[in-house]
């Protein structure tokens, strides 16, 4: 990150400095990640107040504090009205000091995949920074921006939200040249109230574009019509694996044992691509990533090379061989209606006895039962052989699937899976649920017990 002094921080955040004007090379909001001489940002939430841990941060080696009230702790401090806002303002200042070319993306599902794909392509062109993990909220985005240096030629920033206004804030810090909403689905409905609320929140990403920026839209979602007022006269690119009139599309699609092969069509020409990831939905993700990367000047050679080097990551359709003919797909990291139905499609194209193991989908509010039934109906339409559910809500999935069984605990699910593995020599299992469902426990148990 770029070094700054406390007096500079005070000026940026309209705060008051107390104590020495020390220089800062590292920033953290977590006492477990304190490094010698770093700035500890004391955030305050509904259930916590990090001001209470200032002495702990000092003991771990922190060199200064960013606080919203003066503390007796014997460390230099900058006192501001709101540490969360000041943290963002500091990140915005760092962003303004670097020549890095930046793109930003959001969406209901596939954000991380698109981020990883975009970064893989841009890394073929130069030094690229991208969001680590899922640090995509109003704390994670500033933390990512603070990692920028003048050596970074490109940056790919993922933006997430669980309430209105969050993306408007984080995109104002990010200042991207191109921005994209990957897709829209029922996710975080408790925070947004409806799918229309989700669309409004995600569309905030386009408010951060300059007049000559590029707004990238999923042509398969009609919600972009609601964003026209935000996008204005900015240049628009559309992507879709289905719509032939899109700027970025795919033809000659072939699903192989190595992944997915297709011809990627772009405004500057076509290129044959091997995407070493399962699932047709990843074609759409690859088109989205290509559009973002090409907005910053990536060529077709970089696109082809970048996509070819991708690897599945645990929790996101990660393939695990139980036996030579029995495959476990670990998609347990998270779930909403869009990603669940995409997973159904992936499983439907796999060999053998196709079994989906599902946990609850969280944060769906009043639409929860309907959303779970929708996934079950998708499983039925896709012709899956078996759906096993566990959790208070997911019974609606197995019931609507027509081939389902519901269980009260994961141990019972694992026991049933072991029976099915013994019965079916060729079998594919896909495990998925929201983060709170902790479906990785099923994956881990299957790996530990195998098929005996």
Task: Give the predicted meaning of each segment.
Residues 47, 313-315, 332-406, 452:
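Active-site beta-alpha connecting loops in nucleotide-dependent enzymes
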Residues 105, 111, 314-318, 436-442:
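ATP-dependent carboxylate/acyl-activation modules
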Residues 1-89, 93, 278, 348-352, ...:
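N-terminal leader/targeting and accessory segments in enzymes
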């Amino acid at each position: 990150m770029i070094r700054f002094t406390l007096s500079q921080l005070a000026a940026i955040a309209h705060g008051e400095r107390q104590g020495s004007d020390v220089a800062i090379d590292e920033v953290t909001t977590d006492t477990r990640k304190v490094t010698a001489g770093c700035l500890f940002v004391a955030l305050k939430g509904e259930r916590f107040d990090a001001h209470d841990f200032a002495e702990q941060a000092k003991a771990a080696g922190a060199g200064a504090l960013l606080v919203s009230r003066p503390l007796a702790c014997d460390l230099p401090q900058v006192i501001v009205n709101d540490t969360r806002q000041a943290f963002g303002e500091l990140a915005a200042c760092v962003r303004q000091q670097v020549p890095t070319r930046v793109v930003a993306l959001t969406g209901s599902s596939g954000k991380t995949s698109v981020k990883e794909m975009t970064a893989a392509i841009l890394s073929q062109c130069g030094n690229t920074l991208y969001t680590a993990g899922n640090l995509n909220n109003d704390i994670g985005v500033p933390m990512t921006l603070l990692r920028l240096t003048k050596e970074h030629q490109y940056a790919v920033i993922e933006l997430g939200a669980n309430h209105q206004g969050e993306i408007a804030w984080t995109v104002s810090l990010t200042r991207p040249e191109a921005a994209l909403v990957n897709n829209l689905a029922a996710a975080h409905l408790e925070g947004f109230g409806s799918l229309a609320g989700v669309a409004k929140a995600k569309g905030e990403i386009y408010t951060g574009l300059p007049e000559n920026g590029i707004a990238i839209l999923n042509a398969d979602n009609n919600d972009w019509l609601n964003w026209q007022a935000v996008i204005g006269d900015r240049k628009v690119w559309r992507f879709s694996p289905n719509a032939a009139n899109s700027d970025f599309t795919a033809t000659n699609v072939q699903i192989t044992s190595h992944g997915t092969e297709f011809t990627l069509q772009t405004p500057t020409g076509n290129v044959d691509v091997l995407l070493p990831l399962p699932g047709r939905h990843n074609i759409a993700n690859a088109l989205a990533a290509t559009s973002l990367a090409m907005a910053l000047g990536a060529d077709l050679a970089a696109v082809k090379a970048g996509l070819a080097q991708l690897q599945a990551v645990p929790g996101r359709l990660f393939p695990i061989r139980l036996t030579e003919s029995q495959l476990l797909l670990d998609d347990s990291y998270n779930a909403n209606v869009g990603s669940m139905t995409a997973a159904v499609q992936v499983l439907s194209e796999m060999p053998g006895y196709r079994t989906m193991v599902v946990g609850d989908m969280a944060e769906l509010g009043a639409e929860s039962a309907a959303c779970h039934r929708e996934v079950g109906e998708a499983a039925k339409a896709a012709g899956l052989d078996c759906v096993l559910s566990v959790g208070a809500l997911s019974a609606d999935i197995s019931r609507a699937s027509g081939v389902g069984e519901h269980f009260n605990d994961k141990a019972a699910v694992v026991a049933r899976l072991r029976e099915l593995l013994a019965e079916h020599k060729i079998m594919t299992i896909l495990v998925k649920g929201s983060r709170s469902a902790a479906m990785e426990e099923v994956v881990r148990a299957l790996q530990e017990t195998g098929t005996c």
